[in-house]
Each structure stands twice: as C-alpha cells, then as structure tokens.
Amino acid sequence: MVEVIRYTCMKQVILLSILLFASPSCDAQNSTEMSNEQNSFEVAKSEQEWQKQLSAEEYYVLRQRGTERPFTGEYNMHFEEGTYNCRACSAPLFASDSKFDSHCGWPSFDGGIESGAIIEKLDKSHGMIRTEILCAKCGGHLGHVFNDGPTATGLRYCVNSLSISFDKEDE
C-alpha cells in the first residue's frame, strides 16, 4: 500500500515538473512570435521605441498582450460620436455607431471601421482558445473578438481602453 502511494506521488511530482518547465518555453515562444510579427507591419518600431512612446500600462496592453481590469477603462461607458483609433499608431479602428454596452466591463463594438483595419489571430494563451484582435497597421494588441454579440453581426469586439484613443466627431 505504501509503495502504491509513493508511486502515485512520484508520478504527480514528475507531471508537475514537466508542466512547470514547459510553461516558460511557451511564453518565450509567444514573445518571439510578437517580435517576429513587428517586422511585418507598416508601423514597425523596436520595443525600446514603443516603451518610450507608450505609458507603462499602454505598453503592457498593446505590446505584451495584457488586459486592463474590467470596468476601469475610460471608454467602457463612453458613447460620444466619433472614431476610436489605435493608441500606438493612430490608425482608425472603430466607429462610435458600432459601439454598444455589453456589460462585460470593456468597450465593445460589433465590427471594425473598415475591412482590413483589424487582424484576427488565434490565441491559445491562459488555457483558453480565443480570437485575438490586433491593429493591422502596427500589430498592437486590442483585445479579443467573441461570437456572442447582440447586434446583427453577432460579434463582440472586446477592446482594452488603454489600446485606443478617441477623436470626437466635428459638429
């Protein structure tokens, strides 16, 4: 009986060790992918240049694929008429008429401002399978898109406020 328990514990320790050593290599691969992607965008800067241009929080979201806490972003409940742009490169991304309150804590849109403004990419991070959205001009991480939107498109582009800026429509 003691041998069975010892054997089971040993298997668990080995499995846990494998998982712990595999995790950093997965993160390193994602970091390498992001570095390689930078070179394929119209606006391509070094990480040092992005760090100088963006605040620490903006850099975390846009360049390191971070997420701001829900209900804390300046554009979550913002419904003025205008255009939401990429905070890193100023590319237009979303029109205000596509914005809606999804009650999720982040700004939500039912589509991009025009075809090709946003790139969708498979994201298997954090044990989930999602679709990441990136600015097509600079590759900045915007958030994720889900197929549970309440509008005719059926989509919900869930965007970090830190990844966008807003230009008010002229009256």
Please describe what each predicted stretch is.
Residues V13-F21:
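Sec-dependent N-terminal signal peptides
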Residues E42, Q51-N85, A91-E171:
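A short Gly-Trp-Pro
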Residues P24-S25:
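C-terminal motif of bacterial Sec signal peptides marking the signal peptidase cleavage site
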Residues M1-V2, L142:
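Feature for soluble, non-membrane regions of globular proteins
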Residues T8, L16-S17, M34:
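Composition-driven detection of intrinsically disordered, low-complexity segments
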